[in-house]
């Protein structure tokens, strides 16, 4: 089993490998547990070996991330008389761990949470780093809190029943970690794309562990996204490709998987980086190639740029110019794989041109 340490204020470990979930009972250590999970996973909860627990069912995927689901969760916690000494377990995909984390952050002003992610995306990203949140009509993840888990169990056995689409979507986040910090990930996936998509392979475990190591290092240095300034990049480097991706998800009414939208977002970020940061033509082309090889989309030409641009105004990386009061867009870009920089207030015409290039088939 692989272990990755997340060295934040309260350090915790991410356990990665087959059978990791069997360590949950020991981590709960006799406390009462509220397991937050979708209905499709309820039948697996008895395997945890926890005697005293309550199950809080939530909808699948992004449908879970609503204020209404939170209110129901708080009601269930109250009915179960959950105390500050008890614990919440987030068991599911990234949306489930987001909701479980937010419930833990807000119940009695904060109780412990452990995440047992069941998708590649949740293992590589959502379950690690303490970000929680829900969506509102104005945008994705606009309401939330930072609340770190006390442990994360990435049991690769839980991935074996995932649809291929979910595996591909999650692998997009792993590819992202290759571009922002660890180019070895890109080499491994380029050389072995089929094995990278096989959740039972050692190749998959290697790139997953590398991606988690990247995420752990970034959040350990900048847990609350406070290192980033107008031009500097701290934890926001994890949002490479996300500015466009979140806009696409909103316009697609969340019918696209996050990784699918982020794949297009990374192509856009590469084009923007080519324009402003001197990213080579070769890396721009490689971005398209590696994402295509694992079955992810690299274009989204059915949505007009003007519509996406309006949605970007509520992106969390946007800042207000103190002198003019004008909203300033900021994009995470790369000079080369592993070398990140912030692109601040790019020209509107350049943005449209990069999207056109991104959408060109």
Swiss-Prot record:
- Asked whether the UniProt record includes RNA-binding among its keywords, one would answer no
Subcellular location as annotated: Cytoplasm
Q: Which SUPFAM superfamilies match?
A: Dehydroquinate synthase-like (SSF56796)
Enzyme class, broadest EC rank: lyase
> Could you say which EC number(s) this protein's record lists?
4.2.3.4
Q: What does this protein do?
A: Catalyzes the conversion of 3-deoxy-D-arabino-heptulosonate 7-phosphate (DAHP) to dehydroquinate (DHQ).
User: What name does the UniProt record give this protein?
Assistant: 3-dehydroquinate synthase
- Species this chain originates from: Cutibacterium acnes (strain DSM 16379 / KPA171202)
């Amino acid at each position: 089993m692989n272990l990755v340490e997340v060295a934040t204020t309260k350090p915790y470990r991410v356990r990665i490998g087959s059978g990791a979930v069997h360590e949950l009972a020991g981590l709960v250590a006799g406390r009462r547990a509220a397991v937050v999970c979708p209905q499709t996973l309820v039948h697996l909860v008895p395997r945890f070996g926890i005697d005293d627990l309550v199950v809080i069912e939530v909808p699948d995927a992004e449908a879970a991330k609503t204020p209404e689901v939170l209110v129901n969760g708080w009601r269930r916690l109250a009915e179960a008389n959950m105390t500050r000494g008890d614990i919440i377990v987030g068991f599911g995909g990234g949306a489930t761990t987001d909701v479980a984390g937010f419930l833990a952050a807000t119940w009695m002003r904060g109780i412990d949470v452990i995440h047992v992610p069941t998708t590649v995306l949740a293992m590589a990203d959502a379950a690690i780093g303490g970000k929680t949140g829900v969506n509102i009509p104005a945008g994705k993840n606009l309401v939330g809190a930072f609340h770190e888990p006390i442990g994360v169990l990435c049991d690769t056995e839980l991935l074996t029943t995932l649809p291929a689409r979910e595996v591909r979507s999650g692998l997009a986040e792993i590819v992202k970690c290759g571009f922002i910090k660890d180019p070895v990930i890109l080499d491994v996936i380029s050389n072995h794309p089929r094995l990278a998509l096989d959740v039972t392979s050692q190749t998959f475990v290697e790139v997953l562990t590398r991606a988690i190591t990247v995420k752990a290092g970034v959040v350990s240095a900048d847990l609350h996204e406070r290192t980033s300034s107008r031009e500097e990049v701290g934890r926001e480097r994890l949002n490479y490709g996300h500015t466009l991706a979140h806009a696409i998800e909103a316009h697609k009414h969340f019918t696209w998987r996050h990784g699918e939208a982020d794949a297009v977002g990374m192509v856009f970020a590469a084009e923007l980086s080519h324009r402003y940061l001197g990213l080579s033509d070769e890396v721009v082309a490689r971005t398209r190639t590696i994402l295509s090889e694992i079955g992810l989309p690299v274009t989204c030409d059915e949505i007009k740029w003007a519509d996406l641009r309006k949605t970007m105004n509520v992106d969390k990386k946007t800042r207000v110019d103190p002198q003019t009061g004008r909203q300033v867009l900021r994009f995470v870009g790369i000079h080369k794989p592993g070398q990140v920089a912030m692109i601040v207030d790019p020209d509107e015409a350049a943005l449209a041109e990069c999207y056109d290039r991104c959408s060109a088939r």
